Amino acid sequence: MQSAADSGAVSAASAGSNLNVEANAVTAAYGYANGVNNVTVTVNQPPSTGNFATNPQAVEVIVGQPQPRLLSALFGTGPVPIAARAVAVPNAGTGCVLALNSGASPAVNLSGTNKVNLIGCNLYSNSSANPSMNVGGSATIAANYVGVVGGISGASNITATNGIRTGVRPVADPYASVSPPAQPSCNSAKIVVNAAGKTTSLDPGCYSGSITVNAGATLKLSPGIYYLDGASLNVAGNATITGTGVTLVFTGSGSSWGTASIGSNAIVNLTAPSSGPTQGIVIYGDRKMPAGTAFNLAGGGTQNFAGAIYLPKANLSFSGGNGTTTSCTKVVADTITFTGSSNLQVNCSALGGAAIGISTAQLVE
């Protein structure tokens, strides 16, 4: 009985939704089906008692069944109530793609012949629409796990080692509590990098004029935070932008907001800071940005971001990481369209930063 309660709690906490269905299916496999032979299976979130009663993610499963008296029949009559209790909590997840929009149809989109490989990591879509996620044409996606709040169109084009689930609960914004430091005074001059075959360096600071890197030119960013206040970052195809320990913050006001466009075959090697207020974040979009602001990161196989791309109000078009040399790329945006084949991984221990979603659960009581 205790094994049934333990496994039921772990399964329900890992699933994150349809808790009663998950727990009851598992306990029934142990021979304890709710309502059969006086068995009761009770599922509570949060738990009704114990150290985790105030944890909204904790799941409690109680399996009960009256047992006939044996020797105790000498001292009383009637069956003896026997119960087993278990509590499990979800572990931090291994998500690498999260679409935050709650109603877009779809919030995650992939079509044509594009192939997306999420190496050992999960994809989530918070949209309750049907479809919440679309994999059209002959496009394919491979992941560890796919979980969407709504429905999926093209599920047959998805390969997921640990399953594909619809109707799951929304995943919390992993960077909701992160805010960069106050920005310094801005340089309003437009910066254009034209020198083919040469490297131009840029220091951290605030830039309110556009930054353009033309084909054949290279822009090297020194470590630090770069604020693009109403300014666009434009990296042409066959241009190069590099930097270690950098965060690009796109902000603005009114009708003027920073955005980015990276052309096909641009060479991008940007790595997030491993400490500090923007730890683990390589691109950060202001939460006050108008919903639907367009970002186009379409460098393809030569586009490598090490860290999180966090654009909570952006419609992000993404293509990158084919043959990637980085092992840590997370994409969090309002909506996400894969416009080309991409490889993403989340071996991010060296950079730190927030985990996305849940993966497994562990027993705590």
Give the label of every model feature segment.
Residues P46-P47, Q67-R69, I82, D173, ...:
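Alpha-helix initiation/capping motif
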Residues V43, T54-G95:
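Small-polar (Ser/Thr/Gly)-enriched, low-hydrophobicity segments
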